[in-house]
Structures are given as C-alpha cells and as structure tokens.
From Swiss-Prot:
It comes from Pseudomonas fluorescens (strain ATCC BAA-477 / NRRL B-23932 / Pf-5). The gene is murC. Pfam families: Mur_ligase (PF01225), Mur_ligase_C (PF02875), Mur_ligase_M (PF08245). This is UDP-N-acetylmuramate--L-alanine ligase. PANTHER family: UDP-N-ACETYLMURAMATE--L-ALANINE LIGASE, UDP-N-ACETYLMURAMATE--L-ALANINE LIGASE-RELATED. GO terms for biological process: cell division; cell wall organization; peptidoglycan biosynthetic process; regulation of cell shape. Cell wall formation. One of its GO terms (cellular component) is cytoplasm.
Amino acid sequence: MVENQKAMPQPEMRRIRRIHFVGIGGVGMCGIAEVLLNLGYQVSGSDLKASPVTERLESFGAQIFIGHRAENAANADVLVVSSAVNTSNPEVATALERRIPVVPRAEMLAELMRYRHGVAVAGTHGKTTTTSLLASVFAAGGLDPTFVIGGRLNAAGTNAQLGTSRYLIAEADESDASFLHLQPLVAVVTNIDADHMATYDGDFNKLKKTFVDFLHNLPFYGLAVMCLDDPVVREILPQVKRPTVTYGFSEEADVRAINVRQQGMQTFFTVLRRDREPLDVSVNMPGNHNVLNSLATICIATDEGISDEAIVQGLSGFQGVGRRFQVYGELPVEGGNVMLVDDYGHHPTEVAAVIKAVRGGWPERRLVMVYQPHRFSRTRDLYDDFVQVLADANVLLLMEVYPAGEEPIPGADSRQLCHSIRQRGQLDPIYIERGVDLAPLVKPLLRAGDILLCQGAGDIGGLAPKLLGSPLFAGAVAAGKGAK
C-alpha cells in the first residue's frame, strides 16, 4: 500500500471497498486507480499485458491480472471501464450478471471530484500540458493538489498524485463525451477542433453544444476559462451562462501575452491582466501553443489567489510532460549531433503547432520527422490537413497508420499519404512498412544539427528510446546527462 494514506472523504463510497479496473494500464485509468489506492481502497485491475504502469500499481498494492477473465471481477464491489470496453468483455458480463455496478472512468473521476474543489481542463488540444502546468503552479503556491493527468508529469514521476488540499485538477475527456459526468468548480476550454467525430455523429454543431453543456455543469458561482484566440471557443462564448474569463494573444482577452520570445526550449513572455501589474514569465517549452496553455494556468492561479511569485516559479520550474515535445537526448552523426525529440501529437493542428515551435526555437536547423498517423478514420477525415502540415518537414518518414482497433479504410493509409504529399512537390516522403527497423533507415538521412522528431499517438512512442539505445548510434547521450 502507498505510504501516507489519506482518509477517505467520500461518504457515499463507504460501502465500496473493492474497486476493479478493466484495462487498468490505460493512461486514463491508471491515475484514478493510483489515487484510489492512496485513499485506502482495495484496487484490482486487468490488462492484456504487463507494463511499467501495471508494475507501478502492483508495487502500491493493486492486484493485477494479465488477461480478461470472468473470475477477475468476482469479488469487486464496482467495475470501472473505459469507453473502449464493451459488454462482451467477460469481466463486464460477469459484473452485469451479478448486478455489480459498472461505471465509466469519468464517473469514478467525478466521484473523486464531488467533495473537492474541482478544476477540469477540456479541449481538443493542450489538455495534458495545461493540467500539468496547473499542478506545478498550485504546488509552487503551497496548495498540494490532487491531480489526474493523461501523461507522465516528469517532476512527479507519475500521472496522478493524491494531495492534502481540497483541490483536484484533472483532464476532461471529450473523445467519448464522458466529460459531461464531471461537475467542477472551474473549467478550461483550450480549443475545439474536429476530432473523435464518430462520438458526435459527424456533427460539428453537436460537438460545440456538448462543450457548452459541459461548461453548464459548473455551478452558477463557478468559472469558465476560455481561449479567445480559438475561433470555435469564441463562437460558443455568448452561449455560456456562467462567469467567464478569457485568455489569448487577442487584445480583447482578459489575460493576454505580449512580447513573446523563444530561445530553444525556453519561451519568454509578458502577461497582461486587468487591474494587475504586467508579469514577466518563462516556461521550459517551445511554441505559442504552450504560451496559451500557460495563460490558462495563470487565469486560474490568479483567480485562486496564488501569488505572482509562485506563478513565476511554477512555470519556470516546470519540467514537462512525457511525450509532449520530450527531448530524449543527442544522437551522434558525422560532424556533430542530432537532437532527438518525441511527441504525442496526432492531429494536424498539433503537428502544425510543433513544427512551428521547432521553426521558432531552432530556425537554422533541419527538421527530420518520423510520423505515425493514428487511426484510419482520423486519417480519412483530416486527410487534406495532414497532407498540408506534414509537407512542411524537411525530411519525412511516414510509418503505417496505427489502427487503434480499427479496420483499414481504402485511401486512408500512409502509402496514399506519401503519394499525395509527393504530388505537392515540396519533399519526397519515405513510406515505412510496419515492423521495419528504423535506425538503419534514419541514420543516413541525418546531418549534424538536425532535429529528429518522432511523433504520433501509437506505438511510435517506443521509437525514441530505441534509437537512443541503438548500436548504430553508439555514444548517444540521454537528456540530462550532458545532451546539448
């Protein structure tokens, strides 16, 4: 069991002692499981394979099952499931047969939030980074929040932590509309873009309305923090019948950034807030998109009474999030080194933001990009946008689409993407079949001073550490151990 257990504050959950997670290794599940372990609940969970995540939970006292079997859930008081799990799962089927409650992941998160000062971060892009920045700034302000994040907060070494204060900071997931379960006191909407459209029957208006409904889960005394630079957020703003504060680069925003300057991994800017002195801040992340994420954090921190000194400290001391422009280290090539970066971006808007950040922070360097599209349906729906943004790399290697459980869709694969990008005449992309060792393919393409970006939400996440440890890159230096 985790040390420093906190007493359980959820009166309605006193009868619940044994909580079972189906798919406990998932990024949205493991954090909630860890918080519940810290609260003193008996936690078990199943997954298809062991991982560092399941091993960590097991070390904290969770009972982990590899594989899904009916008997795994036999003694549970409640089952927690993600949207990827359906009633054909034997554990879910057993629970339903025995009248054991089966609740969505977001409903369990909402239960944790019920008796706390909830801060929920929603939006198509930037949720994980903004949530992580909030956790960092709140900690710098001495508030010790509980947080549940969709990525590993590097400073904490985890994506979830039970704090001692009344604050709970969490991501609000719109992909399956489950964020409608949450009832926070403060909510952020970073942006609204076309993604996960199957959830919304392909109707963008339905997606927009769902975000408005989410904000109306706030109490009448709550606060909606909204990015005025995003055209769709700006469009729904008049429909929101809750107190609001806006942020962005726009002169109309309540909290805005000026004098933005990027220097490699660091971004410097000045924050203007109504009736406050200008505040000079820096954050250890490149790109204007991370300035916006920082502004959302500053809005909430200011509203909660966190001092400017703590805001500056929390932002400048932020150590980043796993797979969000994560610098792995330096790869040796003839004449020098190549900076190796890993990133989770899997939507054209995210890809474009990262490319822009690279151009802004390292304008003299070439960008060599290994990209893996995520889902055939997303590739089909956003095909032209992918063609446009991926063509902006200097060198592009396209891995085959990571299916994420989907069947192939004709014309929505990486081979076709390569063809369409090639027709633009900007560069000649290289198609990579699944299972190919990339190190021998990548090395001849690299020059000293290049930035090698591995990007996507699928199993490409394992590529950067493989390259760092490849014999072809003997002498590679991991980040934090002398990397340039």
